[in-house]
Regions:
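A structural signal for short, well-ordered beta-strand segments and their strand-loop junctions
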Residues: 156, 198, 257-261, 268, ...
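Active-site/ligand-binding-proximal alpha/beta "capping" segment
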Residues: 205-264
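N-terminal donor/sugar-recognition subdomains of glycan-related enzymes
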Residues: 1-131, 136-153, 163-166, 182-186, ...
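Glycine-rich phosphate/pyrophosphate-binding loops
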Residues: 160-161, 168-178, 249-273
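Short secondary-structure boundary/capping segments
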Residues: 12, 170-173, 214-215, 266, ...
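Conserved phosphate- and dinucleotide-binding cores of soluble alpha/beta proteins
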Residues: 5, 248, 258-285, 290-296
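Hydrophobic, small-residue-rich alpha-helical packing segments that form membrane-like cores
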Residues: 113, 117, 141-143, 155, ...
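Short, basic, glycine/proline-bearing loop/turn elements
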Residues: 126-131, 171-172, 223-234, 293-304
Length: 379
């Protein structure tokens, strides 16, 4: 009860402990409690000790009369801890593989377009962005996207690239962070020479070597900052490609970020991806993951998703909640799962309301000189 907190804090001075983070007060009935716990557990000094988590109830009274409440609190904590650490592989294989890719990619990265140069030339030059994902709802949005492509900067997840190309839509940025080489299929036989390919430093080396017009970007992680290659960093790439698109749009200073194709759920026919997806509308990689039902777009019933997509959704909500002062996020998917901390608006309404000006045209930023690149490689 809030009254008990007030009574306790009026008799004991805990101001120093509260300010220093030794004590956190969390209201488990608050609407944003999941976001608050994610922020808490994602802090470095907290993250390191998550494996030691245990709920202690130090009063028999609460065990006797409030067992359901502390069980609920315990379940909330465990659920959000799992979201924070779900992507850790117990064998560390993924972590080692990503680090191996980074080391292999450093020569290519030094020859690519520095991320900081992109920011210096393009940041805060336009307000409206569209992030395109490859969910089942994308196909119905493509005609309108084509009509408005000159009035919004388009960030395209690699899996949606083929669908856009077939409609004659040229994205400004294409994002990729796959540590496997499956994504090579998304880029083969493409005519596009003007999009900027934004790649994570852990992207599979085969794809990094294959692509032109690329920027290989370091993650905002202390491990990568130790290389002192500051021209090529730093950004939160997240754990799925659309997350990378959103953080890139935020880094470039966009104020209105519209999302389409961001279903994060199966459609009524059981499709995982949009028509035209390179691996098929029913991608086999999604079939064997544990399923659950979540609230649908616009609150209209429920849709079927799986735990990986659900993790992505929660992490996006965390990202949007943390950046709601910097940008307005519009969910114009018109399908899939509801994503909190976004305004649900039809794509047509978004276009008519926001996309009234032509976007600026940019030359591709230049890479470092060979001399500068060689010096950095020697370091």
């Amino acid at each position: 009860e809030i009254e008990l907190f007030i009574l306790a804090l009026s008799t004991i001075d805990l101001s120093e402990e509260l300010c220093s983070g030794k004590i956190y007060l969390v209201d488990i009935e608050e609407e944003r409690v999941d976001i608050q716990l994610l922020i808490l557990f994602d802090m470095k000094d907290m993250f390191e000790y998550l494996s030691l988590y245990e709920m202690f109830v130090n009063n028999v009274y609460y065990k006797k009369f409030y067992e359901d409440v502390w069980h609920k609190a315990d379940e909330l904590c465990e659920k959000n801890i799992k979201v924070v650490i779900r992507n850790l592989n117990s064998s560390l294989c993924i972590g080692f593989e990503c680090y191996s890719h980074l080391l292999q990619n450093i020569p290519s990265m030094l020859e690519s377009i520095p991320f900081q140069r992109i920011l210096s030339e393009r940041k805060n030059k336009f307000e409206n962005a569209i992030v395109v994902s490859a969910g089942p709802s994308l196909a119905k949005q493509l005609p309108l996207l084509k009509a408005y492509q000159d009035k919004a900067v388009i960030f395209c997840a690699d899996g949606a690239l083929s669908m856009l190309e077939k409609e004659g839509i040229i994205p400004d940025y294409v994002t990729n962070l796959d540590f496997t080489d499956l994504a090579m299929k998304f880029f083969q036989n493409k005519e596009n020479k003007t999009s900027l390919n934004m790649l994570s430093c852990a992207t599979h080396p085969s794809l990094v070597h294959f692509l032109d017009n690329k920027s290989v970007v370091l993650r905002d992680d202390p491990l990568y900052q130790r290389f002192n290659l500051n021209d090529f960093g730093y950004i939160d790439t997240g754990t799925h490609v659309s997350h990378f698109s959103y953080t890139l749009a935020l880094a470039l200073g966009f104020k209105n970020i519209i999302m389409i194709g961001q279903d994060l759920a199966f459609d009524e026919e059981g499709n995982s991806h949009s028509k035209g997806f390179d691996f098929g509308e029913k991608f086999s990689g999604e079939e064997n993951i544990d399923k659950l039902k979540v609230t649908a777009y616009a609150g209209k019933g429920e849709v079927l998703t799986h735990i990986t997509w659900n993790d992505y959704r929660i992490k996006l909500e965390y990202l949007f909640a943390c950046n709601e002062q910097k940008a307005k996020f519009y969910n114009a998917t018109e399908g899939g799962a509801r994503i909190n901390f976004t305004e649900e608006l039809s794509f047509k309404e978004c276009c008519e309301k926001l996309l009234t000006k032509e976007k600026p045209q940019f030359e591709l930023p230049k890479s470092l000189t060979k001399n500068r690149s060689d010096k950095l490689l020697v370091k």
